């Protein structure tokens, strides 16, 4: 069975290479016209579109307050008071504070850590 499979594979490979050579030689002899891609305009490079401003900032991006950060537990951490602010990881209390304070990007639920719970 294995020998039959190998034999069929070899015959198929020879057939593929021979038919490819026929097409190449016919193309070089101008017997075949080049095929035009009908959908070539579809794949043409389009003008780059301007990015729209996101409603929230991802981790490490600039922010003004906690409500600007996307994640439920993300907080806006600022260096030197109000300078160089960016979204960083917070905790469960951050999520609760955002739930009460934020109108946009308000967390639906706050994840609790499973580290302190006993399994048993």
Swiss-Prot record:
GO terms for MF: toxin activity
Signal peptide span: 1-16
Any one GO CC term of the record: extracellular region
Domain named Agouti: residues: 56-95
Tissue: Expressed by the venom gland.
UniProt keywords, alphabetically: Disulfide bond, Knottin, Secreted, Signal, Toxin
Compartment list: Secreted
Family: Belongs to the neurotoxin 05 (agouti) family.
Protein name: U13-lycotoxin-Ls1f
């Amino acid at each position: 069975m294995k020998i039959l499979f190998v034999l069929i594979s070899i015959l198929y490979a020879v057939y593929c290479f021979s038919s490819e050579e026929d097409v190449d030689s016919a193309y070089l002899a101008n017997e075949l016209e080049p095929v035009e891609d009908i959908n070539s305009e579809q794949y043409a490079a389009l003008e780059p579109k301007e990015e729209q401003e996101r409603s929230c900032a991802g981790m490490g991006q600039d922010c003004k307050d906690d409500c600007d950060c996307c994640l439920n537990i993300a907080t806006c951490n600022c260096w030197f008071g109000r300078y160089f602010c960016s979204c960083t990881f917070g905790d469960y209390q951050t999520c609760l504070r955002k739930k009460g304070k934020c109108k946009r990007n308000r967390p639906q639920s706050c994840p609790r850590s499973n580290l302190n719970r006993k399994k048993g």
